[in-house]
Amino acid sequence: MAFNNQELFNKLKFNAFMVWNKREFSRLFSHALVHGGWLHLIVNMYVLWMFGKAVETTFSDHVFFPKTYSYGKFLYVLMYVLAVPVASLPALFKQKNNHYYNSVGASGAVSAIVFTTILLAPDLPLGIILIPIQLPAYIFGILYLAYSYFMSKKDKGNIAHDAHFVGSVFGFIFPIFLNPGLIHNFIFQITH
């Protein structure tokens, strides 16, 4: 495991300088395989487990995705895998000449899965682990995006808030490309 192998960890982590200047494009994907610690990994996998099955099932539903439902599992995996590099694009462009910028984890892709759920079920009660307050998913999503945006502008700490933001937006938009009617379904659910 990369937790105990610093050399492997360093080869897999996202480093914008190495991607941009050394053409190590595999880092756009590989950073999702390593995490900053056990808690980081456990939280990402827990959230993926909580939301992933519903998204996978919905992608396989002929009502929501009449033209692509037979490829539901494939589309779910495709969206997740594409979300990994897409969520890293802001950091790539912003940090491309910074030797010292690194990031790890799958949080951007996991955020994509959460926001697909928000698109599909905007009234679903959502909250934060260990905090007993829940909000409708679309309100939670707005607050999450606002928080991620403002924290990314502060550019402090070791959390890739820009990856969370972009991953979330990608997870909301990707299913709409598959079925544009989902946006009407979303609007109907939040207005009725």
What label would you give each PLM region?
Residues 1-192:
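A detector for small-residue-rich transmembrane helices and their helix-helix packing motifs
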